[in-house]
Every structure is written in structure tokens, then in C-alpha cells.
Regions:
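A short acidic, often aromatic-flanked loop/helix-cap motif at beta-alpha or helix-coil junctions
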Residues: 60, 79-84, 173-177
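Glycine/small-residue-rich loop that forms an oxyanion/phosphate-binding "nest" at active or ligand-binding sites
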Residues: 66-98
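Short acidic-hydrophobic, aromatic-tinged amphipathic segments that line or gate anion-handling sites
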Residues: 3-6, 72-77, 165-175
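Boundary-proximal intrinsically disordered activation/regulatory segments immediately upstream
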Residues: 1-61, 146-147
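Short beta-strand segments
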Residues: 33-34, 55, 96-98, 117, ...
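Short, conserved catalytic or adaptor-binding loops enriched in Gly and charged residues
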Residues: 63-68, 157-161
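Short active-site oxyanion
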Residues: 27-30, 48-52, 70-72, 139-140, ...
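RNA substrate-binding interface of SAM-dependent RNA methyltransferases
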Residues: 44, 100-102, 106-192
């Protein structure tokens, strides 16, 4: 495990950028996750962990499992650790992993599918993904204007569903056509103020 001693550390800066910048997440294909529960969910799902940062003095068998999987391990004192977090009171572990890659083929035979268009609030999106998994939906389609499904707030709100529930991004017309071809009826609701 490498001890981070400077705010200029490349791994620390990488994690902080993953939390702040959608373009950076997209270019690296990684997402930022926080907490021991999420680390366990990532490991159980087979997600490819890249960088794991723990607070000085904190340990868990999950950290050893991440190391065995090939993740780079770092520790940092509280003041530096907080720089990588997106929350005011960070948990004991922050990590990056590869974003799950789902293609439109995940919709074939998926059964019930939830299609979302223009859902911009990250917390709401994460909660909906978590609920969709709880109701055993086969997939979720995100259309234009939806929040980034790999932003830290969405990932945190999913409580691990982001690793298990196929989440496909498609234009609305293409998604509707594909679902129709699969024999799925489309029902719509819209908020009018």
C-alpha cells in the first residue's frame, strides 16, 4: 500500500477528477465509488477495480480482496483523503472501477424495461435504478437529457444496483423502436407543471 503525502499525488488527483468531471469519467471509462458496502458490491459483481484509497489506519478484508484482484492500493491522512471525496463526511474507502458496459443487446429478452427521458436529478436517477432492480426489471434505458449514471451521486444512490442492472443509453426513438420490436408495450407518464 502506498502512503499519499501530498495533494499533488497523481492517484489522489485522478480520484478527485472522477468525482467532478463527467468528460473525464467518460474518457477513462471509470467511475468513483465510496464506502465499504459499495466496495463489497463491486467485488461481488466482478467489476474491475482500479484504484482504492483508504483512510490511514482503516482496514477491511475487502481491501485485501481488491488488491488480489489487481487494484492499486493507497492510504492517506484524513485531510488528504477528503480531497478525493464528493461528500462532506466521507466513508473510510474511496475507489475507482471500470464503468459497467451495457449495449442495446441487453434489452433483447430483458422482460420489463424502464425507459427514462430527461431525468436530470442524479439522486432521483440513482433511487429509480435501485427501485427498478428491487422490482426485478430487466433493464433501464436512459434517453436524452438524463443525468450521468456514473456520477458519484447516482452511484451512491443506487446502493450497488449500478453494478447489476443493465443500464443502456439510447436516443428515445431508437429505444422505443427496439422495445416495440421486442414486443414490449410502451406506457408513458409526463410531469406537467
Amino acid at each position: 500500500m502506498i502512503e499519499i503525502q501530498s495533494r499533488q499525488n497523481a492517484a489522489l488527483k485522478h480520484l478527485a477528477r472522477l468525482g467532478r468531471e463527467r468528460k473525464y469519467r467518460r474518457s477513462t471509462g471509470e467511475m468513483l465509488c465510496e464506502g465499504e458496502k459499495m466496495l463489497g458490491e463491486a467485488l461481488r459483481s466482478g467489476a474491475k477495480l482500479k484504484t482504492v484509497l483508504v483512510k490511514d489506519g482503516w482496514d477491511s478484508p475487502l481491501v485485501k480482496a481488491a488488491e488480489e484482484q489487481g487494484a492499486s492500493l493507497y492510504s492517506a491522512p484524513d485531510a488528504l483523503f477528503k480531497l478525493a471525496s464528493e461528500v462532506e463526511t466521507p466513508q473510510n474507502v474511496i475507489f475507482s472501477c471500470e464503468q459497467p458496459q451495457w449495449t442495446a443487446d441487453a434489452l433483447d429478452g430483458a422482460g420489463q424495461v424502464l425507459l427514462l427521458d430527461g431525468l436530470q436529478d442524479p439522486g432521483n436517477l440513482g433511487t429509480i435504478l435501485r427501485t427498478a432492480e428491487a422490482f426485478a426489471l430487466g433493464a433501464v434505458v436512459l434517453c436524452e437529457g438524463c443525468a450521468d449514471p456514473f456520477s458519484p451521486k447516482v452511484v451512491r444512490s443506487t446502493m450497488g444496483a449500478v453494478f447489476r442492472l443493465p443500464c443502456v443509453t439510447l436516443p428515445l426513438a431508437e429505444a422505443a423502436e427496439r422495445l416495440h420490436r421486442n414486443g414490449l408495450p410502451l406506457y408513458a407518464t409526463a410531469l406537467h407543471e
